[in-house]
Amino acid sequence: MSFTRRHLLLGVFAATVGLSAGLAHAQAKKELTIGTTAGSNIEVLRRGIQPQLEQKGYKVKLVEFSDYVQPNHALAQGALDANYFQHVIYLKNFAEKNKLDLADIVQGPIAPLGLYSRKFKSVAEVKEGARIAVPNDPTNLARTFVFLEQFGLVKAKPGVDPLKVTEKDLAENPKKLKFVPLEAAQLPRALDDTDFSVINGNFAISSGLKLTEAVALEKTPDYYLLVAATRTQDKNAPWAADIAAAFKSKFFKDVLDKHFPGYARPAALQ
């Protein structure tokens, strides 16, 4: 065998061994860091997902965030392996706007959006000129207007994409409601200064509110269910498949039945 051919074969062998070792290392990943937000989201993971992953031999670290911005940047930068706090519309819009290569891997439950008040008990009590605190991020603001339209409080112009509704897209606001956009985490605190607040379920719960205390709760469409997300390059990794499987398990359904009644769920968890 010639010197050149021998070295070529050795090079191919070394590359093959290196690739195999790399794949083995990827498959052997046993530490997972998952980001989420305070309140119900971290509790859902702690009670329903973390135990299943630990039973499979993973060491799981849950990292809590107080906003909807940091978890995706932390995931894209490699500080997290996965996150669970957002619906797929928010994920896609955020990833596109910030040029992040992220992908959803499975749907999960969500504490529904709710209309809350310390002053009033029903939608019928909404008065003219009432001040309503609303989420300031575009996707959840659009979701809020669709929610309020269910009760005839506003109406969007014909042909407007319901996923992109803004205040400028409202054709009707019969009670001349005044909307106060705030960071989602601040909405519970706004209850003392406004007539109503439209609050994402996880932040309502983390602030001590109960879903049963809401003046009204959203009938959550499937596209607003939360998703677990990873970097796109990792979405088919064995550990990502294990995360997805945990969200689809009977164990998880039983946890939701016992500890999280009233949550909107994917069909597989009904």
What are these regions (language model features)?
Residues 112-123, 225-237:
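A bilobed periplasmic-binding-protein/Venus flytrap-type ligand-binding module shared by bacterial periplasmic
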Residues 38-61:
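Short, polar/charged alpha-helical segment
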Residues 93-105, 120, 193, 198, ...:
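Ligand-binding "clamshell"
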Residues 68-99, 114-116, 121, 141-144, ...:
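Pocket-flanking alpha-helical
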Residues 105-155, 253:
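A conserved helix-loop-strand patch within extracytoplasmic ligand-binding domains
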Residues 62-73, 160-189:
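Short helix-initiation/N-cap motifs at beta->coil->alpha
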Residues 5-9:
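N-terminal export leaders
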Residues 23-33, 54, 123-129:
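Immediate post-signal peptide segment of exported/extracytoplasmic ligand-binding proteins
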